[in-house]
Amino acid sequence: MGCVPPKVQIEAAPQFDPSRISSLAVLPFQTIKTPQLASSSRGGVRDPEEIRTQFRLPGTDQADGTEFKKVRYVVPETAAHRITKQVASVLSGRPSLRVIGPEESFSVVGEESSEKEMALPVMAQKVGAHLKVDGVVAGLVRTYREREGSKLGAKPAAVGFEVYLIRPSDGMVLWTGEFFEEQKPLNQDVVGFFEKGGGFVTAATLAELGVNKVMKAFPVGLGEQGPPLPAPSPKEIP
């Protein structure tokens, strides 16, 4: 059986203290725009067109020593909307948190964010100051490929997204949760295959499973029962 890479990766800044956050605003998640070329990061949060290695699907961004072919997959806006709602729903279920949903949060910046291509940290600062919250949750959907075929035999679905917790006072990314999974067949991922009912699931189901896994690792609003934070990474939070 093949080796299955981690489906969830977590990073936390040394300054992150979950106990200091009792209110959150959730911004609508962004999507990868295609076709795009990679560009440098802004303010600690990667631009939507930047694709990291773990979020490349088979056959994309492969280097053979002389050629470097880039193929991009279209991520539908409906996928970002669905994942945003799922994240907001999980957070709203934590009684100790005051959560402001994506509609009210986005109304603070509205069309201005699209017209000026406003970076996420800047949006978070404006939203946080206006709504008077301790943190702003934002995200990026990098991959959303639907299953082709039936549950019993198919080209599997693939979903990849990131969740950011941003400090409104200065736009710093305090916590990042990343999820990517292209469902594997039984002989490559026994646990994962039966976790999904013993068949190939849709992208919507895979996304819901991913949100649950990432948010299980999100310690805000869980008190002392929250998951331990990972050791701070010496590199800049992406």
Kindly give the residue locations of the regions a language model identified.
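N-terminal segment of the mature soluble domain
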Residues: 34-140, 168-176, 209-218, 222
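Generic structural signal for helix capping and beta-alpha/helix-loop junctions
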Residues: 107-109, 145, 183
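Generic short beta-strand segments
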Residues: 29, 140-146
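Short beta-alpha junctions and helix-cap segments that line functional grooves
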Residues: 148-152
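C-terminal/domain-edge helix-coil "capping" segments
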Residues: 3-25, 30-37, 127-131, 153-156, ...
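Short catalytic/ligand-binding loop motif for oxyanion handling, primarily in non-cytosolic enzymes
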Residues: 34-35, 145-147
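Short structured motifs
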Residues: 10-11, 122-124, 147
